[in-house]
Amino acid sequence: MKDRLEQLKAKQLTQDDDTDEVEIAIDNTAFMDEFFSEIEETRLNIDKISEHVEEAKKLYSIILSAPIPEPKTKDDLEQLTTEIKKRANNVRNKLKSMEKHIEEDEVRSSADLRIRKSQHSVLSRKFVEVMTKYNEAQVDFRERSKGRIQRQLEITGKKTTDEELEEMLESGNPAIFTSGIIDSQISKQALSEIEGRHKDIVRLESSIKELHDMFMDIAMLVENQGEMLDNIELNVMHTVDHVEKARDETKRAMKYQGQARKKLIIIIVVVVVLLGILALIIGLSVGLK
């Protein structure tokens, strides 16, 4: 009788273990289904951002090719810019949430965890690539718009240097150079384009600053992802090159007071931040090796 009781107890324990394993498997399957659903949603958002970036590039070209762009074109661009920011913030938050959950499960090494890490890394890299293209398109549009302003000023008989033009853009007041323009039909058209391009650049710079903040956040998000370090380091190096060029231009403009001095301070702060990020990346790269 005693042996029979032990057999029944052992059988019951085995059944309980089997039940626990089934419950764990079911829970894990449900969790991974939810994870892949989030991955797909995030991937679709990144693809949509990529489409919007291509549309924005087309609108940039249209605006640059027309002396006085249609208001609807600018409205369409404004809507696209808003949509890109909205989706980009959504993607960033999703990736950060995924990273948090991965860190919480880091103590448990499993095939599922490796899959989640891999998917997170792929999406992060794709997101950086898309947003880098957007940043490049914005910077290109700004430079070409600035060139159009410079040419229109020359038409009116006012020649300006790059430093003087940057001073005008930072002041937010095109009247610094447009005041006193001869009252002729050609000058009026040129003046209208100058003011329009100036407004475009002011709006664009606000977006570029927001994008810069997002890039800093992304850099923190992917800093421990091995191969992602090379991509971020490359992006930072390109940015540093642009900042170094701007700093050299600022040195030549030291004679200007007020806004020019403010510009130098801003550039120095940006350089320090970027060099700090670059140092962090190099340190992490050495650590990973």
UniProtKB/Swiss-Prot annotation:
One of its GO terms (cellular component) is apical plasma membrane. It is a single-pass type IV membrane protein. The keyword Zinc does not apply. The keyword Translocase does not apply. The chain crosses the membrane at residues 264-283. Residues 32-111 form a coiled coil. GO terms for biological process: exocytic insertion of neurotransmitter receptor to postsynaptic membrane; exocytosis; intracellular protein transport; long-term synaptic potentiation; modulation of chemical synaptic transmission; neurotransmitter transport; organelle membrane fusion; positive regulation of cell adhesion. Pfam families: SNARE, Syntaxin. InterPro entries: SNARE, STX3_SNARE, Syntaxin, Syntaxin/epimorphin_CS, Syntaxin_N, T_SNARE_dom. Residues 284-289 are extracellular. One of its GO terms (molecular function) is SNAP receptor activity. Keywords: Cell projection, Coiled coil, Membrane, Neurotransmitter transport, Transmembrane, Transmembrane helix, Transport. It is found in: Membrane. Its main location: membrane. SUPFAM superfamilies: t-snare proteins (SSF47661). Expressed in the retina (at protein level). Residues 1-263 are cytoplasmic. Belongs to the syntaxin family. Interacts with REEP6. Isoform 3B interacts with PRPH2 in rod and cone photoreceptors. Isoform 3B interacts with ROM1. Isoform 3B interacts with SNAP25. Isoform 3B interacts with VAMP2. Potentially involved in docking of synaptic vesicles at presynaptic active zones. Apical receptor involved in membrane fusion of apical vesicles. Essential for survival of retinal photoreceetors. This is Syntaxin-3. It comes from Mus musculus. The gene is Stx3.
